[in-house]
């Protein structure tokens, strides 16, 4: 007898820790990262002493992320991978004012903002000297058009689970200070441009001007997204999706010859 399908409850924490990539849903997607998807990239901010990952670059606190600050997670040692599991995951949709808690928002509505980006969340953690990693290729399943997430170390298991910073003892406290930072650093088109600190794809290095994207009815989505988002209409691989279909010349069907009218003779009696 065939097995019946089984429904399984999935907790929010399980969703938060999923390694989600939009290209996994449909390998035929015409996006900047699919079907030829680049390897995952992680940028790392300044860490406290002693460094948790000695092989990582250590940029100065106020400097933007540069190419030399991007590391390949596939080169992590076993010890570094173990340390990475101690980090808490934070997604941009946690701060999206257009979302309800059911849709993924994790802060109060008064603290939420428009168009939150993972890069700005990473900047907030850097600002407060929290150990943080920016994963550009990871995506929340409810926010697939806004790629990027942050891993931040809040409690150190090597120190009996003590907070890394006594000012922020819980994840809730960290979310609130990030929300405050996002309020004072609103997302603009410059946030995704060449001066954002995120290296642009080669096709964007010259002549690229960031622009807002149109909202799709029924979707909770940013109007400003990272350039490697599948929703970026400027990319040559996705622009054709938004282009109108070319009009096909209409071919008139040949007309059948008119039938001669039948003559009817009426005879009066």
UniProtKB/Swiss-Prot annotation:
SUPFAM superfamilies, per the entry: SRP19
Low complexity compositional bias, start-end: 248-258
Keyword Cytoplasm attributed: yes
GO cellular component: signal recognition particle, endoplasmic reticulum targeting
Sorted UniProt keywords: Cytoplasm, Ribonucleoprotein, RNA-binding, Signal recognition particle
Organism listed in the record: Debaryomyces hansenii (strain ATCC 36239 / CBS 767 / BCRC 21394 / JCM 1990 / NBRC 0083 / IGC 2968) (Yeast)
Family according to the record: Belongs to the SRP19 family.
Residue ranges, annotated region (Disordered): 30-65, 236-269
Domain of life: Eukaryota
Chief localization: cytoplasm
Protein localization: Cytoplasm
InterPro entries: Signal_recog_particle_SRP19 (IPR002778), SRP19-like_sf (IPR036521)
Record's keyword annotation contains Cell membrane: no
Main function: Signal-recognition-particle assembly has a crucial role in targeting secretory proteins to the rough endoplasmic reticulum membrane. It must be involved intimately in the translocation of a wide variety of protein substrates.
Record field: compositional bias (Basic residues): 259-269
Subunit structure: Fungal signal recognition particle consists of a 7S RNA molecule (scR1) and at least six protein subunits: SRP72, SRP68, SRP54, SEC65, SRP21 andSRP14.
GO molecular function: 7S RNA binding
GO terms under biological process: SRP-dependent cotranslational protein targeting to membrane, signal sequence recognition
Protein name listed in UniProt: Signal recognition particle SEC65 subunit
């Amino acid at each position: 007898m065939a097995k019946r399908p089984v429904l399984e409850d999935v907790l929010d924490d399980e969703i938060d820790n999923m390694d989600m990539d939009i290209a996994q849903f449909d390998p035929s997607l015409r996006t900047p990262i699919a079907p030829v998807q680049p390897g995952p990239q992680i940028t790392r901010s300044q860490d406290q002493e002693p460094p948790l990952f000695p092989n990582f670059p250590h940029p100065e606190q106020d400097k933007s992320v540069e190419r030399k600050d991007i590391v390949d997670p596939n080169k992590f040692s076993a010890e570094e991978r173990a340390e990475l599991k101690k980090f808490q995951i934070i997604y941009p949709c946690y701060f999206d004012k257009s979302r309800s808690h059911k849709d993924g928002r994790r802060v109060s509505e008064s603290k939420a903002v428009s168009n939150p980006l993972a890069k700005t969340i990473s900047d907030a953690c850097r600002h407060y000297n929290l150990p943080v990693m920016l994963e550009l290729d990871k995506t929340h399943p409810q926010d697939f058009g806004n790629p990027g997430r942050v891993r931040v170390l809040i409690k150190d298991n090597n120190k009996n689970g003590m907070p890394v910073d006594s000012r922020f003892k819980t994840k809730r406290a960290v979310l609130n200070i990030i929300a405050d930072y996002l309020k004072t650093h609103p997302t603009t088109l410059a946030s995704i441009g060449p001066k954002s600190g995120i290296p642009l794809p080669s096709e964007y290095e010259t002549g690229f001007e960031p622009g807002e994207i149109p909202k799709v009815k029924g979707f909770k989505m940013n109007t400003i997204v990272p350039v490697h988002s599948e929703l970026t209409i400027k990319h040559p691989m996705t622009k054709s999706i938004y282009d109108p279909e070319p009009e096909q010349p209409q071919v008139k069907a040949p007309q059948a010859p008119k039938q001669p009218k039948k003559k009817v003779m009426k005879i009066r009696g």
